[in-house]
Amino acid sequence: MIRGAVYRVDLGEARRGHEQRGRRYGLVVSPTDMALSVATIVPTSTQAQPAVFRPEIELGGVHTRFLVDQLRSIDVRFVHDEPAFFLHRDELEEVEVAVARYLGL
C-alpha cells in the first residue's frame, strides 16, 4: 500500500446507519513502509454533504469528498488492484489537516 494513493476498496455490504459501504475509492493514509495486514483508509463519495472535515478534491475530473469522519482500517485483501490515483502533496496535506481537525489533534 502506498500512502497518498487512492485505490478501489470494498467496504462490504453491512447496512449500519450512515456508514459508507460497497465498492468505492479509498485514500490510504497508513504508512507506506509498514507491511501490515490492514490499511487505514479514508473512504470517498461524490454525493456526500460538505463539511470542514470532508475536503473536496478532483479525481479523474470528478469532484470527490474525502470522508475523514469515516476513517477506518480494513483488511488489505479488500484493497483492489493498483492505485487508481495519486494525490499531490498539497492535496494529501489538505486531507491530513482535516484528519487532525476531526480527531482534535
What are these regions (language model features)?
Residues 1-105:
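Conserved functional hotspots at enzyme active or ligand-binding sites that engage polyanionic ligands
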